[in-house]
Amino acid sequence: MSQKEVADFGLIGLAVMGQNLILNGADKGFTVCCYNRTTSRVDEFLANEAKGKSIVGAHSLEEFVSKLKKPRVCILLVKAGKPVDYLIEGLAPLLEKGDIIVDGGNSHYPDTTRRCEELAKKGILFVGSGVSGGEEGARYGPSLMPGGNPAAWPRIKPIFQTLAAKAGNNEPCCDWVGEQGAGHYVKMVHNGIEYGDMQLICETYDIMKRGLGMSCDEIADVFEKWNTGKLDSFLIEITRDVLRYKADDGKPLVEKILDAAGQKGTGKWTAQNALEMGTPVSLITEAVFARCLSSLKSERVRASKKLTGPNTKFTGDKKQLIDDLEDALYASKIISYAQGFMLMREAAKEYGWKLNNAGIALMWRGGCIIRSVFLKDITEAFREDPNLESILFHPFFTNGVEKAQAGWRRVVAQAAMLGIPVPATSTGLSFYDGYRSAVLPANLLQAQRDYFGAHTFRVLPEAADKSLPADKDIHINWTGHGGNISATTYDA
């Protein structure tokens, strides 16, 4: 090792997340090299936040690479998309076989798979790692979800598991996820669940605010109480804080915020992928659509003056409804996570990934936005049965939904009577009822498809006979009286 090769790893991208991850590394005993395309930011960082710490700077990619111990570990925290490709194009010629590039941004998993394959041809090991926890998580311990070229894991494991948050018995919220784009895929699903959790909380707030006429402080008190029990989570905690925050005039700041939600696309990716996989991730998808509907602010204002609906106030037992809301939120969250793990199960089959669901749940227990107390129970469920088909089949969650569902149903019914939209809460309940139904009306749907498009259908084994044979794709002439049965290629 030359005197120049001093850094245990390097990081490119000095926005707040990048700076905080570097400071996290320095605090935990690593020497870190930093670089930014706008090199003045390197100097500013070294002169301020990084001053006196084991952090060195570089003013070019060449200098950056020269300061890294071999095999080199280069972490990129830059905007997803073309900026990542441009940076890789600049870095790759400077690296040697066995060196590692880690993309820690919110990249789309197919891009990560492509980059893995392209860089493997050059002998460079590529990793796409989900990073969750926001600015504070990056600074003190994020959830890290690395996947890509498995040959990189032995080198980056001690770095990543040291940087990561700890949960349970000091277990790091980081483990190897899988090959290709598996790490970024799991982060995508994490973000989809995050969309679902946030929408569920907003719907719960809306019923308390508009349905019960509660103040923000009163609602904050409810969330604070819930955060000591089965709903204990980061998002419940920050919701309490947000509701209590006052503007300069002493009024709740949240009431002054425009009700048009933004989104960066990762929730949409989850919904799109669910459709491609044919997996009913309905709650997360409704959460995405709820943001889309919120963005139609001016149109909604016009609609509010033209379209009628219930305008009644709740007159029942307020305490009972608040208790029901707790149950509805809890049960709906279980559905959201069940759907997320269902989607990852299908992705593992599709892409040949060996996903460790217990490990994924553990990664999400600390440091990340969706961290919550019941992730411990998901971890334990998958440790007991790594092949668990659905978390809904584990006794803890089966019993949890069983106890909560009466209140859940009352909330959905009451929201409808009050005219308050609860798209995520209601679709969660609809999924639950559909999932537990041995018989669904898809038989009629199949008949309709065969009637207008000759798409064929199959019959129930117990209903089969000579005219309607089992295990055959059947087409009927629906305008006659039976007959004209023909087998064709089944087209779903």
Curated annotation (Swiss-Prot):
<keyword id="KW-0311">Gluconate utilization</keyword>
<feature type="binding site">
    <location>
        <position position="449"/>
    </location>
    <ligand>
        <name>substrate</name>
    </ligand>
</feature>
<protein>
    <recommendedName>
        <fullName>6-phosphogluconate dehydrogenase, decarboxylating</fullName>
        <ecNumber>1.1.1.44</ecNumber>
    </recommendedName>
</protein>
<dbReference type="InterPro" id="IPR008927">
    <property type="entry name" value="6-PGluconate_DH-like_C_sf"/>
</dbReference>
<feature type="binding site">
    <location>
        <position position="455"/>
    </location>
    <ligand>
        <name>substrate</name>
    </ligand>
</feature>
<feature type="binding site">
    <location>
        <begin position="78"/>
        <end position="80"/>
    </location>
    <ligand>
        <name>NADP(+)</name>
    </ligand>
</feature>
<feature type="active site" description="Proton acceptor">
    <location>
        <position position="187"/>
    </location>
</feature>
<dbReference type="InterPro" id="IPR006183">
    <property type="entry name" value="Pgluconate_DH"/>
</dbReference>
<feature type="modified residue" description="Phosphoserine">
    <location>
        <position position="215"/>
    </location>
</feature>
<dbReference type="InterPro" id="IPR036291">
    <property type="entry name" value="NAD(P)-bd_dom_sf"/>
</dbReference>
<feature type="binding site">
    <location>
        <position position="106"/>
    </location>
    <ligand>
        <name>NADP(+)</name>
    </ligand>
</feature>
<dbReference type="InterPro" id="IPR006113">
    <property type="entry name" value="6PGDH_Gnd/GntZ"/>
</dbReference>
<dbReference type="GO" id="GO:0061688">
    <property type="term" value="P:glycolytic process via Entner-Doudoroff Pathway"/>
</dbReference>
<feature type="binding site" description="in other chain">
    <location>
        <begin position="132"/>
        <end position="134"/>
    </location>
    <ligand>
        <name>substrate</name>
    </ligand>
</feature>
<dbReference type="GO" id="GO:0005829">
    <property type="term" value="C:cytosol"/>
</dbReference>
<keyword id="KW-0597">Phosphoprotein</keyword>
<dbReference type="GO" id="GO:0005739">
    <property type="term" value="C:mitochondrion"/>
</dbReference>
<feature type="binding site" description="in other chain">
    <location>
        <position position="291"/>
    </location>
    <ligand>
        <name>substrate</name>
    </ligand>
</feature>
<feature type="binding site" description="in other chain">
    <location>
        <position position="195"/>
    </location>
    <ligand>
        <name>substrate</name>
    </ligand>
</feature>
<feature type="modified residue" description="Phosphoserine">
    <location>
        <position position="107"/>
    </location>
</feature>
<dbReference type="Pfam" id="PF00393">
    <property type="entry name" value="6PGD"/>
</dbReference>
<feature type="binding site" description="in other chain">
    <location>
        <position position="106"/>
    </location>
    <ligand>
        <name>substrate</name>
    </ligand>
</feature>
<feature type="active site" description="Proton donor">
    <location>
        <position position="194"/>
    </location>
</feature>
<dbReference type="GO" id="GO:0050661">
    <property type="term" value="F:NADP binding"/>
</dbReference>
<dbReference type="GO" id="GO:0004616">
    <property type="term" value="F:phosphogluconate dehydrogenase (decarboxylating) activity"/>
</dbReference>
<dbReference type="GO" id="GO:0009051">
    <property type="term" value="P:pentose-phosphate shunt, oxidative branch"/>
</dbReference>
<comment type="subunit">
    <text>Homodimer.</text>
</comment>
<feature type="binding site">
    <location>
        <begin position="36"/>
        <end position="38"/>
    </location>
    <ligand>
        <name>NADP(+)</name>
    </ligand>
</feature>
<dbReference type="GO" id="GO:0019521">
    <property type="term" value="P:D-gluconate metabolic process"/>
</dbReference>
<feature type="binding site" description="in other chain">
    <location>
        <position position="264"/>
    </location>
    <ligand>
        <name>substrate</name>
    </ligand>
</feature>
<comment type="pathway">
    <text>Carbohydrate degradation; pentose phosphate pathway; D-ribulose 5-phosphate from D-glucose 6-phosphate (oxidative stage): step 3/3.</text>
</comment>
<comment type="function">
    <text>Catalyzes the oxidative decarboxylation of 6-phosphogluconate to ribulose 5-phosphate and CO(2), with concomitant reduction of NADP to NADPH.</text>
</comment>
<dbReference type="InterPro" id="IPR013328">
    <property type="entry name" value="6PGD_dom2"/>
</dbReference>
<dbReference type="Pfam" id="PF03446">
    <property type="entry name" value="NAD_binding_2"/>
</dbReference>
<feature type="binding site">
    <location>
        <begin position="13"/>
        <end position="18"/>
    </location>
    <ligand>
        <name>NADP(+)</name>
    </ligand>
</feature>
<keyword id="KW-0521">NADP</keyword>
<keyword id="KW-0570">Pentose shunt</keyword>
<dbReference type="InterPro" id="IPR006115">
    <property type="entry name" value="6PGDH_NADP-bd"/>
</dbReference>
<comment type="similarity">
    <text>Belongs to the 6-phosphogluconate dehydrogenase family.</text>
</comment>
<feature type="binding site" description="in other chain">
    <location>
        <begin position="190"/>
        <end position="191"/>
    </location>
    <ligand>
        <name>substrate</name>
    </ligand>
</feature>
<dbReference type="InterPro" id="IPR006184">
    <property type="entry name" value="6PGdom_BS"/>
</dbReference>
<dbReference type="InterPro" id="IPR006114">
    <property type="entry name" value="6PGDH_C"/>
</dbReference>
